């Protein structure tokens, strides 16, 4: 259902309705989190960040290095390079921190040092994955 929203090029409101009206799978939880952070699905970094968060949410996935374990896997999936994946995720993190106030970030992410200063890609993705794991 959520993939239909992307394939049909619908907007964030349609995405939210698709997420809200169905069972909350890990993929939908990540989509909702990114929606709540006002990151548009049109950003390439949206897809890449979503994949990275989902990889880290998998209890069986062990990540020792983003540059060796995460970015190359996502790059291969999308026919891109690790450098482009990292750059687009950084752009997405920048967008999130540009459009959200500290209060908005606290409302979505909770009280955490991550809401005060823009974190690195690794810190942001790791934090989001851990937040979603704890909400299970």
Give a label for each model feature:
Residues 23-80, 93-97:
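C-terminal output/effector regions of signal-responsive regulators
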């Amino acid at each position: 259902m959520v993939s239909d929203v992307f394939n049909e090029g619908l907007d964030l409101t349609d995405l939210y309705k698709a997420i809200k009206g169905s069972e909350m799978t890990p993929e939908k939880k990540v989509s909702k989190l990114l929606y709540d952070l006002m990151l548009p699905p049109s950003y390439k970094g949206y897809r890449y960040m979503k994949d990275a968060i989902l990889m880290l949410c998998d209890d069986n996935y062990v990540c020792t290095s983003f540059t060796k374990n995460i970015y190359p896997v996502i790059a291969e999936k999308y026919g891109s390079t690790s450098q482009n994946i990292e750059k687009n995720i950084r752009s997405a993190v920048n967008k999130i921190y540009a459009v959200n106030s500290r209060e908005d970030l606290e409302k979505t992410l909770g009280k955490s040092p991550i809401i005060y200063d823009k974190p690195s890609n690794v810190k942001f993705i790791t934090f989001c994955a851990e937040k979603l794991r704890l909400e299970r």
